[in-house]
Amino acid sequence: YLNHTYPNTVMDFSRAVARADVPVVSHETGQFQVYPDYREMAKYTGVLYPYNMEVFRDRLARAGMSEQAEDFFLASGRWAAELYKADIEMDLRTEGLAGFQLLDLQDYPGQGSAYVGILDAFMDSKGLVSPERWKGFCNEVVPLLLTEKFCWTEGETLTARVKVAHYAARSLQGTGLAWTLRDEQGHVIGKGICPIVSSGRGLLEVGDIRQPIPVTGKARRLNLELAIEGTDYKNTYPLWFYPEDRSTKESHPGITVAKRLDGHVLSALENGGKVLWFPERDRYASQTVGGLFQTDDWNYRMFETISRNNRKPVSPGTMGLLTDPSHPLFRSFPTDFHTNWQWFPIVKQSYPLILDHFPKGYRPIVQVIDNIERNHKLGLIFELAVGKGKLLVCMSDLEAADDK
C-alpha cells in the first residue's frame, strides 16, 4: 500500500482482521531493501567471506559510481527506516490485530542477498535510525498520529486524531498526551494536551488536534511530537506546508518549457536560452525504468526471476532518491537528501532515464538509486549545457502529479 496509496496515517487492516475468526498476526512486516554498506566487509575475519558484497562493489565500480556507495547506503537506509515506521504503525493502528512479526532486525545475506535489516549481519546497528527513534514507533506503548496527509497548504487548519497503542503493564489513565508542533529551528508553532481517560489496554482513543497554520509565504517542514507525560514514550512525524499560491503555469521570461526537443527548442538552446524539458514517457520507454516510491522489496534478483517465470510485471527495482537539499532547485521544496513523503506524487509519475552512457563523473541533481544487480545511473532531474544554453530535464509528469 505504501507504493500505491497517497501517504497518510489513517489506513489500517481492521476490515480484513474483522473477517477472521482466529487471531491474526502480521507476517514479515517491512523487508524494505537497503543498499549494502561495503565497509561491513572488513568485519569478516573468520571462515566466512562476503564474496557477494565483493561482486556488488565491483559492479558499482564498473558503472563509475564507487564513490557514491556510502551515499546510496545512507539515502536508501534512512528512507527504509521511515518505511518500517509507516508499516509498523499501520499494524499498531489496526483494531484487533494480535501482533506483528519482522523476519529479523538484521540483514539476510542469503537468497540473492537481502539487505533488509536495520542491523547488519553481525547484529550491529547500521546507524540509520537511533534506538530512541525506533522505540518511538516500536514499543509497548506508542503514541500515534492519524491524519489524511503529510502535505498541507498554509492557512489550512491542521486536523488529526491521536491514539495510543498501549500494551504495557501500568495504566495510563490520568496522564496526558502532549503534542508540540515545531519548525526546523525548534520554534513552537502550536501545542496542547489530550487527557488519557481510559484505564484499558489495546488501541486507545485519546483526542484530536486542531492547529491553524500561520501564513509565511514560504514552503517549510514542521515536526509534530507526541509524548506521554511522565514517561519516555514519544513519537514524531514530519509535515510539510506550502504557500496557497501554487501556480506553476505562468510564463517565465527566458525559459522555454517543452515536451519535445524540436527545432524551435534546439535553436533556443544554441542561442543561450534556458529550457525545461519534460520528455514524453512513451517516447523513451526503452531508456527508462518505472517510478517506485518505496525501496525494492527483499531483493531484485529473486522477484525479477519469479515475475518473469510467471509472466507478471517486474518491479522497477529501485531504492529511493539521492539528492542535495542545498541545491537551488529546492528553495521552495524542502527535502532531505533521501526520499520522504512529500515526494510521493512526483515519484509515482516518474520514469527515470538511464544515463549509463553519460560521462562517468556526471551526477544528476536528483538521482534514483538502482539495485545491486543492474547498477544503472538513473536521473529523475538533471541539467546539461547545450550549445550556449542550459537544459533542465525532469523525468516526471508533474501535471499528472499535481493532484493534491
Question: Where are the model-predicted features located?
Answer:
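Beta-strand-rich binding/interaction modules
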Residues: 155-197, 206-212, 220-229
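Aromatic-rich peripheral "rim/lid" segments of glycoside hydrolase catalytic domains that contact
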Residues: 103-168
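Catalytic beta-strand/loop cores that center a nucleophilic Ser/Cys/Thr
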Residues: 2-11, 15, 284, 304-403
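Flexible loop/turn segments at secondary-structure boundaries
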Residues: 32-34, 107-114, 188, 264, ...
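Substrate-binding/catalytic cleft of secreted carbohydrate-active enzymes
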Residues: 1-120
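Short beta-strand elements
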Residues: 195-198, 232-248
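Outer-membrane beta-barrel proteins
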Residues: 76, 148-150, 167, 199-201, ...
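Short alpha-beta junction capping motif
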Residues: 252-301, 388, 394, 404
